[in-house]
């Protein structure tokens, strides 16, 4: 028996030593006298695969499996070669057959799970197979490793952490097990434990560069900023290309890769907690944010922090400093494109947006595009997002004279496309919101560039000439980098809504019939502790009242219920509505008695939704544009008495309207009447106001004058807006 197995053993030893060519020659010689030895054919397949001959390896594995169908390793080798050769369907079919034939082989189940995931993206099927494999072999390393990676990709952080702990218990000397545990804990926000796990992984071996990056993230989240910088430097010294690749993987679409800035990383991580209305560490978060704005090397340049800042109690000048840092960083990385002067015919106006899709921006803007005066204006729309098949996307496409989808080209190509249209004015509807591509604007594809609607605040950019605002929206003109173009009455517009679900009932939403319903349909990013505290004061003062919230993409209501209980308000008085189609969303608003606004980042389109449904909106006008949007809308609608100046006044007004039924009903009647009188709801009127603004901006540009503050609502002469030179 020993003599018979000698060629097998020698061939296996040669393969283990990396001597595939010698193994192949030995096996071919042996097969000449033993042509039906399945094990020899299997080993020859392995040798041919190692030598880079997958077709020949496939034939050898197939022959081995034919000779001995129970030789699982040979049949698995055949599947592997089918994958290498790109014959995925055949590989999947054969792998599935192996699962049927060998249901008790854990490794085989794990192999099929990985193939199913890689070839078909079937995450649920892969997880089920790995669960079966681990039921048979609880410590099976490939199953634990790949199952954990998938759970992390799916965002199932708790399950990923549990899987990683099992992995560590089964393989305590395996660095990848500890690294995976660290990554799962990092994703869960357990930063101390994550750091310990990563350090254990690194103690078992030097680890890849990205493990040092993850260590830097954990240190940054723990506010150990100097140590985080050292970890990032170590990662770059190991593999700078891998680190840059990781940064690029974090970029959304065409956005620039984020810097490995420890303070910015901490702020971004902590902001995720703020999004869940978890304010347990808010004071430290705000302290780091403010300190970062005045550090010696300048504020952070991450644009996401600009969006986050709208919901934070920063001063207008602090927001300007952050915006300047971001815009200067953007401008430094690009070159302007060449452009030809606009023609002498109709004004050519472009609208640039990341939200020409099923999004509120498209809902607001497409009627405006249709309403522009085509005798004087030609309208271009540039989409930074791919088509989603929605009616709103189609409506934008129909409303523009020319629609360009630039989502699949790089920034420079997009800027050149825009420049080729020889615009007079390019209006940016995104600002620093998700999906925006500020680099395009920094390349100056249009002679006049303006910011409007999507980002309530300064962009701090030399490449943005004007912000389209109104006199209510701007409380601190000195804290803007752009010149102001003051639109008459209000900066906003809201097209009338006709599709509204009729006669919805409170019991459909779990609302008490006899209670006063205080609506607060805000995304949790807009809810701040001061506003929530004011809402709780109103609830305490009006015992038969409930606060009606709305579902979001983060689980925030449990945090608010805990905050409510701490304020002496029963948690069950906070109710939540699920997501629904737009007609039902509008219809259910009519079930509310009052709408309570947030303080730092007002409701704007949602406030208009409430007003359209006859629900009074109580707001507080702050010192920043994001905290004055609702005041602008209410003032323009003849409802300025719903605007308050202090938190105490906000509470007092809400309580008075809640308690005084005749006053509340009278206010609701005024709100309903405003639908026919408010300029906010007059799309044609808003189009004329914007056209007046466009004419004024272009007139200065064509005369070679720099941008200057323009009041499009106060005419200096017939058809000429007043200009502050």
What feature does the model see in each segment?
Residues 1-511, 523, 533, 562-569, ...:
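Alpha-helical solenoid repeat scaffolds of the TPR/TPR-like class and their adjacent stem/linker regions
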Residues 383-388, 546-559:
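Glycosyltransferase donor-sugar binding loop
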Residues 574, 579-580:
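Catalytic cores of eukaryotic secretory-pathway lumenal/extracellular enzymes that build
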Residues 598-600:
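A short structural motif in glycosyltransferase catalytic domains
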Residues 606-607, 630:
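Short glycine/serine-rich donor-binding loops of glycosyltransferases
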Residues 627-638, 643:
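Short acidic/histidine- and often glycine-rich active-site loop of Leloir-type glycosyltransferases
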